[in-house]
A protein has these predicted regions:
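Conserved, mostly hydrophobic/aromatic
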Residues: 39, 51, 80, 95, ...
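Short, acidic/polar
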Residues: 60-72, 122-135, 187-194, 254-258
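Acidic (Asp/Glu)-rich catalytic clusters
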Residues: 40-43, 96-103, 134-138, 195-198, ...
Length: 280
């Protein structure tokens, strides 16, 4: 069955309300369009679902991207994520253009990836990624800037004097970001190393999936308690296991995926918005 972007957005937001606590549902009835959760140890409140930049690209045009972003915004979504490396910058450009006039009302996140081979693997390279992202997203600051997809020796490299943490701290000092974090898809062990290195991370993005794909169970069993211990906000992803099959074949639903993710207190939002034939 073909599902339109508009209908999936409506279904997802409805499921987000239904998946929330009774108090959240009561607030929704009073006019809050979608439940929110506290961003880790900080006071920011994020909607429990968000728009992902990677799939926003597959709308195919700026006009279609605008439609998705504006519809989600009107429904109350305030979390928008992206990455410097998504589709050679077009994903960030789509989002930046779509958020014109709305920037101050949203929580905007993007990622840098120069330390894993995309461009210049130095502090200067990371700052160039930041300037690129700010330009494309048409903003002078980010709410959250994250090191993209930690693997291999990334934990050790992040703590070097010219590594990712140095870039995050410099960007904070310059007033270009508010918070710093890191992401990962497949290596819970590396997540642990990054966290236990001692830096006070604000957030991490990792798989939280009811279908148990992409080592999500290992992330949930090993990384989630660490995040709770250090009061690190968890942003969930890959709720459908990174594949449209579980959704299109009726193996699970938006409501089930969200209920599962939100069963963890540390999860404050989940990137679970349909913008292509492949909800993730």
């Amino acid at each position: 069955m073909k599902v339109s972007r508009r209908n999936f957005l409506k279904t997802t937001i409805g499921s987000a309300v239904f998946a929330g606590s009774p108090a959240a549902i009561a607030k929704a009835a009073e006019g809050t369009k979608i439940p929110k959760r506290k961003f880790g140890r900080h006071e920011d409140m994020l909607t429990v679902v968000g728009i992902g930049g990677h799939t926003l690209y597959y709308t195919g045009s700026q006009k279609e991207a605008n439609e998705v972003v504006h519809r989600a915004y009107d429904l109350g979504v305030n979390f928008f994520e992206n990455a410097w490396g998504y589709h050679k910058g077009v994903a960030e450009e789509y989002m930046g253009n779509a958020l014109k006039g709305k920037r101050e009302n949203v929580f905007l996140m993007t990622k840098f990836s120069n330390f894993r081979g995309d461009g210049d693997p130095t502090l200067e390279g990371a700052m160039k990624h930041l300037e690129d992202s700010l330009r494309r997203l048409k903003t002078d600051y980010l709410d959250l800037w994250m090191m993209h997809n930690v693997v291999g020796n990334d934990a050790q490299d992040a703590y070097k004097s010219d590594g990712a943490i140095a870039a995050i701290e410099l960007a904070k000092k310059q007033g270009k970001i508010r918070y710093g974090g890191f992401t990962g898809h497949t290596e819970p062990k590396i997540h642990r190393e990054v966290i236990e290195g001692g830096y006070e991370w604000d957030a991490t993005l990792m798989p939280v999936s009811v279908v148990g794909a992409l080592k999500s169970r290992a992330f949930e069993e090993d990384t989630m308690p660490l995040c709770k211990k250090h009061n690190i906000a968890v942003l969930g992803m890959k709720g459908f296991g990174g594949s449209r099959r579980t959704h299109l074949h009726g193996q699970t639903s938006v409501e089930v995926v969200l209920r599962y993710a939100l069963s963890y207190d540390q999860v404050c939002t989940h990137c679970l918005i349909y913008t292509s034939p492949s909800p993730r």
